[in-house]
């Protein structure tokens, strides 16, 4: 009989313990990018997170000998399940000590929750939507994490290998892209200039008022994401409420010279057909925010990274081109615009977001930059 006790998160005190367990487990870790506490509260609150329009969830804590030793979220994304005809419960935000009993108890709680809701399989690690961290790190444990992904210790996948019935569902890869010290790679320059001339595509210099004002470039960016990511593993279409939420929560932090859009001027409204969003790495700044709090001193480190670019690293949060424009070389326009910006701020390399290992077209974009595939993540599945 297991000595691990599973408790459902039932109140604010439990939720605080759920959120803070990650900070405690990874305190002092040089690679983890801990999320802000306020963002975590928003994510897990049913009355704040717009994903609860089509998701339901429960959160579980694991205790051993009276001590908190693990946590996990059980999530059902009904929108995804219906779109992909896949009745699955997701497990996410999995953290635990190096103990197989704890893992069995945590995933057992998610499995039981899924069965009670009529689900036929368990998949993960996944969040509520594609905007949440995805996959368990299986390679690259000595590499700097990003705010858009999650970090885990090397023993996590080793424990997963001991879990009966769990097999690979999908692998992601991540790349380190080295910024050219000077000049533009000839391939990007040639293709970008040809594409602008031949297809009448343009990359405007955006103002902040255009993102939040009547022109609604923030909404246009997320419309492109909905269309571009529609076929990807784990993705569900963003609702209007989600788009409103993401624009208000995140776009205020973006520097306008690192928010890149491509427009087709052959269309009456200059339709946005491609997007690229980068942000200075906040990992080191977030590590200095004690237990994810901006106050009393954490805010300065975040502002220093965002406004003064006091980091060598830039995170490539999002790159998307509408399918009908990919063969036209539109992606080269993004780098044509962004590489000089990276050089101006002194960034030495960029960290890509997760990419499906089978997505050779996305990975082909990096061929003309010095690059290194330095991380790998896995999502698992098990029939219930």
Regions found by a protein language model. Name each.
Residues 83-165, 290-368:
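Acyl-donor binding region in acyl/amide transferases
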Residues 368-379:
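A structural motif corresponding to the C-terminal lobe/cap of the Radical SAM core domain
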Residues 123, 176, 261, 277, ...:
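Short beta-strand segments
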Residues 2-4, 150-232:
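Acyltransferase donor/substrate-recognition loop-hinge adjacent to the catalytic core
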Residues 1-31:
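Generic start-of-chain signal for non-secretory N-termini
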Residues 22-60, 64, 72-82, 208, ...:
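A conserved beta-strand-loop-helix scaffold within acyl/acetyltransferase catalytic domains
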Residues 15, 78-81, 130-132, 182-183, ...:
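Flexible loop/turn segments at secondary-structure boundaries
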